From Swiss-Prot:
SUPFAM superfamilies named in the record: Plexin repeat, Sema domain
Organism of this sequence: Homo sapiens (Human)
Intrachain disulfide bonds: 113-124, 142-151, 269-379, 293-339, 497-514, 506-523, 580-624
Function as written in the Swiss-Prot or TrEMBL entry: Cell surface receptor for PLXNB1, PLXNB2, PLXNB3 and PLXND1 that plays an important role in cell-cell signaling. Regulates glutamatergic and GABAergic synapse development. Promotes the development of inhibitory synapses in a PLXNB1-dependent manner and promotes the development of excitatory synapses in a PLXNB2-dependent manner. Plays a role in priming antigen-specific T-cells, promotes differentiation of Th1 T-helper cells, and thereby contributes to adaptive immunity. Promotes phosphorylation of TIMD2. Inhibits angiogenesis. Promotes axon growth cone collapse.
Protein name: Semaphorin-4A
Length: 761
């Protein structure tokens, strides 16, 4: 075909050829994958202006690990390294520092810490590990105090912190860990502190302890090995008569070829006073059971990271939600799960059978002997008999497991902390909302509606560089989640409704805090559940039902008119880039040209954008469509006009607002680029290098055959190669012999350059 028939000059034809080659090299854009489990529908990277966050930090302070919300929800108390802060969080935006009191470890304790081979730069400080509200006028706090735990009371005055008096500092052994790296937990119940931590400098003696209050101080018996020496505590949750401790430790009841971690729940009674003769100053009601969080066909999630209690509307059905990971990696990545445990199931297991250790076989088996009344380990009133206490010393492990319900399973991520709440939707139902911190500094918002599995509404990357989320504190009255980490505290509004610009996008988000307001045509924060005109569908995320005034087909495409059309004036023989914002990671995207698909010969899709060679007949309406949950809707619409030929706007699009925009435009003829917002020079270099390699390969092949023939002639015309015997060093007995001549022509040489029918002279 002649060049004029294509309507292109030679340079434009070369540009078209390179564009087609570029189309083959560019990766195909697909809707995200990213491992097993639900994907976050919207991702916000650090510094994304679409997600407004507030950051508090204080010069000279770090390790903002401990968070406590005041009773009125207006003040956030923060335990940092060697300081305690009071932050006013009533107003939106950055929390305001009300006041701060220092509580450093003494110089003597720091010297002793360094003498014991601990680091002066990272360890020999006072890391605040316990911060609880003792009453309306005092807080109670404990810290590592340079590997010498200490505790004290802090007086409050109008929610301001008063300075700590050194003479009121008490020993904190058993309440705070020695090592800031060790996990711990503590909860204040009826004026008594229940704590789980390490009780020695080496970190080899875990302990569950009760201090403060009028009841006697009680603790676990380390000699009886109720806890494995590597027990790691993550949560303490009070109930009506008991306090539950959640932790993980090495399992001793299983025969396994490697050290097997297991998650546990332990229980002690609030009215426990210890034994009179046996188990003096020790728990007499300590029991523990295995927690099981697993999904069929997968390895168990056997390492618990955090647990919280969500009281239900009915006091008979509260649940505990816990975050788990696995000690094993699958495919080089770790996985996480959130499981729900009914308190009724936990109580039932603790009322079941015991395990006992067979001393002859060293195996744990089910105890089948008689039971006494009252039942050993029960929260009965009055002292226990010596027989019951003797039984409790060896029968502290329950036979049955507490099986949880997996709500969220996700690979490629490790969750560290969890905060939960319920949100009432427009349908009047309560939906579980979970906020999950990760080891890489992300915050996930997950929602569970009814019996359906969890879906991830959003993922927020909090830090430019990955680091773990250390603590989460939900402030319902402020509508925010506070995130503690090494450098400060983030304030994260729990919903970001304004990012959803259409009714379809708002409904598909399935965020119980957001609903579409038809009057203002905005996605708004749901302030009251009785807004009948607002639109929301939490169960199905069905925009067909929520966003249409009348009956609609399954696809929204025929009835979807763009809210605005962006007009683009293009130059002939140029590459035009039409961007398409990917509003949802769950959607698949495609382009249309009017009622038809875009022409494949002159276009390609790269990173969601449409790259289009402007030629005759390519003008008109271009729309980027998203398909999600079975529904298609336009994300963005362009009307492309050429400088040489202006098209009349489709009458069906009359009345739609239009906006003239400039998009990346690159000329493929001999001229320079017209709009160099995005350079395709790297792609051009790639294509050029590949073309040069192909050309070089062809030249090598063409030159190789003559060279081979020349080499064969030179070998035949020269001397015969030495025989193996002639290659050995000459001895005295050997005599030099002249080489024998090959009398043959080049045609008498085989493929290996051997003489054929050679006559030897």
């Amino acid at each position: 075909m002649a060049l004029p028939a294509l309507g292109l000059d030679p340079w434009s034809l070369l540009g078209l050829f390179l564009f087609q080659l570029l189309q083959l090299l560019l990766p195909t854009t697909t809707a995200g994958g990213g491992g097993q489990g639900p994907m976050p529908r919207v991702r916000y990277y650090a510094g994304d202006e679409r997600r407004a966050l507030s950051f508090f930090h204080q010069k000279g302070l770090q390790d903002f690990d401990t968070l406590l919300l005041s009773g009125d929800g207006n003040t956030l108390y923060v335990g940092a390294r060697e300081a305690i802060l009071a932050l006013d969080i009533q107003d939106p935006g950055v929390p305001r520092l009300k006041n701060m009191i220092p509580w450093p470890a003494s110089d003597r304790k720091k010297s002793e810490c360094a003498f014991k081979k601990k680091s002066n730069e990272t360890q020999c400080f006072n890391f605040i590990r316990v911060l609880v509200s003792y009453n309306v006028t005092h807080l109670y706090t404990c810290g590592t105090f340079a590997f010498s735990p200490a505790c004290t009371f802090i007086e409050l005055q109008d929610s301001y912190l008063l300075p700590i008096s050194e003479d009121k500092v008490m020993e904190g052994k058993g309440q705070s860990p020695f090592d800031p790296a060790h996990k711990h937990t503590a909860v204040l119940v009826d004026g008594m502190l229940y704590s789980g931590t390490m009780n020695n400098f080496l970190g080899s003696e875990p302990i569950l302890m009760r201090t403060l209050g009028s009841q006697p101080v009680l603790k676990t018996d380390n000699f009886l090995r109720w806890l494995h020496h590597d027990a790691s505590f993550v949560a303490a949750i009070p109930s009506t008569q008991v306090v539950y401790f959640f932790f993980e430790e090495t399992a001793s009841e299983f025969d396994f070829f490697e050290r097997l971690h297991t998650s546990r729940v332990a229980r002690v009674c609030k009215n426990d006073v210890g034994g009179e003769k046996l188990l003096q100053k020790k728990w007499t009601t300590f029991l523990k059971a295995q927690l099981l969080c697993t999904q069929p066909g997968q390895l168990p999630f056997n390492v618990i990271r955090h647990a919280v209690l969500l009281p239900a509307d009915s006091p008979t059905a509260p649940h505990i939600y816990a975050v788990f990971t696995s000690q094993w990696q699958v495919g080089g990545t770790r996985s996480s799960a959130v499981c729900a445990f009914s308190l009724l199931d936990i109580e039932r297991v603790f009322k079941g059978k015991y395990k006992e250790l067979n001393k002859e076989t060293s195996r744990w088996t089910t105890y089948r002997g008689p039971e006494t009344n009252p039942r050993p380990g029960s929260c009965s009133v009055g002292p226990s008999s010596d027989k019951a206490l003797t039984f409790m010393k060896d029968h502290f492990l329950m036979d049955e497991q507490v099986v949880g319900t997996p709500l969220l399973v996700k690979s490629g991520v490790e969750y560290t902390r969890l905060a939960v709440e319920t949100a009432q939707g427009l349908d009047g139902h309560s939906h579980l909302v979970m906020y999950l911190g990760t080891t890489t500094g992300s915050l996930h918002k997950a929602v569970v509606s009814g019996d359906s599995s969890a879906h991830l509404v959003e993922e927020i990357q909090l830090f430019p560089d990955p680091e773990p989320v250390r603590n989460l504190q939900l402030a319902p009255t402020q509508g925010a989640v506070f995130v503690g980490f090494s450098g400060g505290v983030w304030r994260v509004p729990r919903a970001n409704c304004s990012v959803y610009e259409s009714c379809v996008d708002c409904v598909l988000a399935r965020d119980p805090h957001c609903a579409w307001d038809p009057e203002s045509r905005t996605c708004c924060l749901l302030s009251a559940p009785n807004l009948n005109s607002w639109k929301q569908d939490m169960e199905r995320g069905n925009p067909e039902w929520a966003c249409a005034s009348g009956p609609m087909s399954r696809s929204l495409r025929p009835q979807s008119r763009p809210q605005i059309i962006k007009e683009v004036l293009a130059v002939p023989n140029s590459i035009l880039e039409l961007p398409c914002p990917h509003l949802s990671a769950l959607a698949s995207y495609y382009w249309s040209h009017g009622p038809a698909a875009v022409p494949e010969a002159s276009s390609t899709v790269y990173n969601g954008s449409l790259l289009l060679i402007v030629q005759d007949g390519v003008g008109g309406l271009y729309q980027c469509w998203a398909t999600e949950n079975g529904f298609s809707y336009p994300v963005i619409s362009y009307w492309v006009d050429s400088q040489d030929q202006t098209l009349a706007l489709d009458p069906e699009l009359a009345g739609i607002p239009r906006e003239h925009v400039k998009v990346p435009l690159t000329r493929v003829s001999g001229g320079a680029a017209l709009a160099a917002q995005q350079s395709y020079w790297p792609h051009f270099v790639t294509v050029t290098v590949l073309f040069a390699l192909v050309l070089s390969g062809a030249l090598i092949i063409l030159v190789a055959s003559p060279l081979r023939a020349l080499r064969a002639r030179g070998k035949v015309q020269g001397c015969e190669t030495l025989r193996p015997g002639e290659k050995a060093p000459l001895s005295r007995e050997q005599h030099l012999q002249s080489p024998k001549e090959c009398r043959t022509s080049a045609s008498d040489v085989d493929a290996d350059n051997n003489c054929l029918g050679t006559e030897v002279a």
